[in-house]
């Protein structure tokens, strides 16, 4: 903890919490299923390299990223585990992905053609995972085009189809009991259709697997489970799971949280990330004075405010203006006025012991109080994913 004293604004990564979450997922899937956490987008704001190293040491098997530059960063950090690139790889970057021994998602013939050229040029084999369109309508091979796509891949003997995958559209938003009831009753009401949509997608995915199997093509690694699927639906685990937000101790949704806690008494996710800054100034403000840009906050009485050196440049959403709180000396201090690019003002009238360079907690615990990513997301009108992912990468991440 000593190195924290040297930082003006910083993010803490709790190693014990991350290990807890890793063990929780391992307990859910068993030893034979590949545990492949998503560390894309700077590990959802948690620091990709530091998080990846902790995860692998604690029992994760693979790492999932979105782009080649992320894979480059991991390899430069000495990480040798399998890396699966889930996002589109530009033609100019395909050779780099092959050199790095990465698995690539595949759904375009253009990618396959360029991959074929790269394997010849480099005298290396390439490994791909087919992405199947089952109902999310993002990237993926349409079911009717699957066999034609596979036949095209066969033209390139240096390319191996190792995996087949898909991605759910709303599995984190559904009620497990409703979904199960739909399967039994085949009810046509809209709410039940939406509840069963992940299961509709799962049936499509199984159909794709069967098409390949009937054609004599055995794909060894089948995967479709994100955080919610891994936690609630064992039938989605197949050979590999890809937890994302829950790996970092945050719930994909309230529905997932409620259902999981009913199914697994005593098991819990532990948030990994805390975000803190320091008071830069404390000043008195007279009743009737305005605070901040736009004069959106007017002091109703004499008050004391603290100036914090943090703003929307750092990833602290402007939507927190006049709404959000920070924690100072274990108490809530309300934001006064607009969140600025580099500065935020908070009311410390009722925290008389507050001093310059005291810690202000943006996200996390301070004493008995806590500000969660879900609370911040609700204020900003977004999701917890965005709250942590948008924290500026230049802010130091410190493992504690």
Feature map (PLM): residue ranges:
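Active-site-proximal beta-alpha core segment in soluble small-molecule metabolic enzymes
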Residues: 2-5, 9-15, 19, 27, ...
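Active-site anion/phosphate-binding pocket segments in diverse small-molecule metabolic enzymes
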Residues: 2-15, 19, 69-70, 89, ...
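Active-site phosphate/pyrophosphate- and oxyanion-stabilizing loops and adjacent acidic/basic residues
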Residues: 23, 151, 385
């Amino acid at each position: 903890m000593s190195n924290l004293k040297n930082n003006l604004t910083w993010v803490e990564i709790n190693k014990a919490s991350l290990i807890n979450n890793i063990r929780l997922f391992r307990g859910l899937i068993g030893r034979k299923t590949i545990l492949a956490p998503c560390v894309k987008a700077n590990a959802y704001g948690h620091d990709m390299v530091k998080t990846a190293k902790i995860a692998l040491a604690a029992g994760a098997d693979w790492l999932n990223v979105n782009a080649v530059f992320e894979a480059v960063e991991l390899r430069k950090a000495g990480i040798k585990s399998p890396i699966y690139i889930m996002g589109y790889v530009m033609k100019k970057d395909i050779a780099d992905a092959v050199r790095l021994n990465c698995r690539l998602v595949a759904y375009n013939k253009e990618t396959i053609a360029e991959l074929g050229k790269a394997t010849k040029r480099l005298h290396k084999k390439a490994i791909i995972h087919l992405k199947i369109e089952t109902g999310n309508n993002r990237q993926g091979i349409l079911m009717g085009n699957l066999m034609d796509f596979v036949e095209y891949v066969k033209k390139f003997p240096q390319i191996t189809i190792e995996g087949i995958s898909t991605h759910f559209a709303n599995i984190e938003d559904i009620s497990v009991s409703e979904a199960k009831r739909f399967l039994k009753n085949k009810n046509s009401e809209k709410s039940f259709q939406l509840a069963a949509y992940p299961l509709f997608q799962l049936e499509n995915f199984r159909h794709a697997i069967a098409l390949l199997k009937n054609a004599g093509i055995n794909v060894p690694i089948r995967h479709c489970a994100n955080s919610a699927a891994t936690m609630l639906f064992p039938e989605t685990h197949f050979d590999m799971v890809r937890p994302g937000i829950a790996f970092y101790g945050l719930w994909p949704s309230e529905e997932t949280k409620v259902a999981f806690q009913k199914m697994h008494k005593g098991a819990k996710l532990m948030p990994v990330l805390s975000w803190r800054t320091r008071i830069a100034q404390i000043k008195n403000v007279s009743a009737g004075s305005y605070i901040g840009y736009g004069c959106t906050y007017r002091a109703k009485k004499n008050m004391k405010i603290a100036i914090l050196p943090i703003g929307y440049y750092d990833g602290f959403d402007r939507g927190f203006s006049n709404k959000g709180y920070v924690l100072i000396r274990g108490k809530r201090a309300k934001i006064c006025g607009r969140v600025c690019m580099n500065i935020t003002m908070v009311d410390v009238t009722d925290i008389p012991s507050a001093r310059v360079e005291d810690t202000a907690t943006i996200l996390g615990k301070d004493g008995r109080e806590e500000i969660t990513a879900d609370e911040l997301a609700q204020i900003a009108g977004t999701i917890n994913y965005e709250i942590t992912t948008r924290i500026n990468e230049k802010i130091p991440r410190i493992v504690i």
